[in-house]
Regions:
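Pyridoxal 5′-phosphate
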Residues: 1-348
Length: 348
């Protein structure tokens, strides 16, 4: 079936507007994506027709809202091929997901002097949470270097493992360089040392199929707004055995089972990590976004982006006015434009 770009553009109302007298061309999807009409409609419909708190009431609207919320969790599970909805935790986004793991993992699994490995190409949301934990808990951050092609130096990674290495946290796709990291190999290397892996999938999920069981990552995180969903909603996938072992990140609301002044018991997974009233409208809209791209086909999206990437690279390479950064022949990248004159090869 043909990839009908014109038809797909019609699904995005904002793309029908003019900017400075010309049709809008939007290239900032690495920061946030525009929203198809079906996602906006899902938000409006829930507020107009279903709005009620979830997991809290026995009345009709609450039950209906809860069903939509948990159906969204199942949609996410299916989209990334997790084993169980118990492994799908809703958060505010990739940044909060990483902070959740950093806080709970350090509290439950690390001691002063223990080490976490990150890469030199990480987004600051996968650097600063670990720096905060280093200041508070005395853990040590070790960094995987990159070479002049913008790729991880895997041999150097191997040398970073020590008996005190407790976690590797690495991007699936770099938001700056666009490098698609060999996550399966990284996970296999880490697991050979008995070390779990967190993968930042914020820039991967919108562009390629993601199968968390195939990757074998212990944690995988992404944001809804980068995959045509609403802002303020994100996902933490965690293997059930790891989520069971970690302490809660925040307290109150959804995450409690019983409360008394003598002690509190916590809800079962995944609610154990979902304190407060969840963004149940956001989860429904996220599910609609994932259904939307699934209907188009993630394989077809990836193939079309590859065609665009190859054409863009060709045009860039014959231009004498554009500075190129990155390995031109590296086919697993597309193009990032920065200030219109600097070009980085990436998957963004």
């Amino acid at each position: 079936m043909q990839y009908d770009v014109a038809r797909i553009r019609e699904d995005f109302p904002i793309l029908s507007r003019d900017v400075y007298g010309k049709p809008l061309v939007y290239l900032d999807n690495g920061a946030t994506t525009q929203k198809p009409r079906c996602v906006v409609d899902a938000i409006v419909n829930e507020y107009y027709s279903v709005n009620a708190n979830v997991h809290r009431g026995v009345h009709f609207l609450s039950q209906q809202a809860t069903e939509l919320h948990e159906a969204a969790r199942e949609t996410v599970r299916r989209f990334i091929n997790a084993r169980s909805t118990r492994e799908i935790v809703f958060t505010r986004g990739t940044t909060e997901s990483i902070n959740l793991v950093a806080s709970s993992f350090v509290a439950g699994q690390m001691k002063p002097g223990d080490e976490v490995i990150v890469s030199q190409m990480e987004h600051h949301s996968n650097i600063v949470p670990w720096q905060l934990q280093a200041e508070r808990s005395g853990i040590v951050i070790r960094v995987i270097p990159i070479d002049d092609r913008g790729e991880l130096m895997e041999d150097a990674l191997e040398q970073l493992f020590t008996p005190r290495t407790k976690l590797v946290s690495v991007a699936h796709v770099s938001n700056v360089l666009g490098t698609v990291n060999p996550v399966e190999r990284i996970v296999a290397r880490a697991h050979a040392h008995g070390v779990p892996v967190l993968v930042d999938g914020a820039q991967a999920v919108p562009h390629q199929p993601v199968d968390v069981q195939k990757l074998d990552a212990d944690f995988y995180v992404f944001s809804g707004h980068k995959v045509y969903g609403p802002t303020g909603i994100g996902v933490l996938y965690g293997k059930e055995e790891w989520l069971d072992r970690l302490p809660p990140y925040q307290g109150g609301g959804e995450m409690i089972h019983t409360v008394s002044f003598s002690g509190t018991t916590f809800a079962e997974l995944p609610l154990k990590f979902e304190a407060g009233t969840p963004d149940y409208v956001g989860t429904t809209a996220l599910a609609r976004a994932l259904d939307y791209v699934s209907t188009i086909g993630m394989d077809r999206i990836a193939a079309y982006e590859h065609e665009l990437t190859q054409y863009a690279k060709f045009r860039i390479c014959i231009s004498s006015e554009i500075r190129r950064i990155g390995k031109v022949s590296f086919l697993s990248r597309s193009v990032i434009f920065t200030r219109w004159i600097w070009v980085l090869y990436s998957t963004g």
